[in-house]
């Protein structure tokens, strides 16, 4: 479990709270929940006051933060982010990108992001352009 995945459409379980959605991969693996780590992630994502809310009570940006929290909870070496800002407004998109950059720096995680947004792609250390299944330039 060294890869955390962040989906474009969040893929949150609608009947689970923010906290329960973040803990889902840990509980599915029957691992012990690290409550301190959970609280640190909620603070990192600025979701401490929303941890008992259901996904439908959150904005799109907050839902994407929950998806990021779920990925961070498993201590991945790599985070694969598939269009993480695709469904967000520009303010929320900026916030999500800043969180991913912060995760890269603070948690030493490699972020692999798929995006069609050139402005977001330009923020990366390295860009791979894939066209028709082939890498065209790097």
Task: Kindly give the residue locations of the regions a language model identified.
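Conserved catalytic loops of ABC-family nucleotide-binding domains
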Residues: 2, 102-113, 121
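Conserved ABC ATPase signature
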Residues: 54-64
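Catalytic Walker B motif of ABC-type/P-loop ATPase nucleotide-binding domains
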Residues: 79-82
């Amino acid at each position: 479990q060294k890869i955390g995945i962040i989906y474009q459409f969040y893929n949150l379980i609608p009947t689970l709270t923010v906290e329960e959605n973040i803990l889902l991969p840990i509980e599915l693996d029957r691992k012990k929940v690290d409550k301190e780590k959970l609280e640190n992630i909620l603070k990192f994502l600025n979701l401490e006051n929303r941890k008992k809310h259901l996904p439908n009570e959150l904005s799109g940006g907050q839902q994407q933060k929950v998806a990021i929290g779920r990925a961070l909870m498993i201590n991945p070496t790599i985070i694969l982010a598939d269009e993480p800002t695709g469904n967000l407004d520009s303010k929320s998109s900026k916030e999500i990108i800043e969180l991913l950059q912060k995760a890269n720096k603070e948690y030493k995680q490699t972020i692999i992001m798929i995006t069609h947004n050139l402005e977001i792609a330009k923020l990366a250390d390295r860009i791979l352009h894939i066209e028709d299944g082939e890498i065209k330039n790097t």
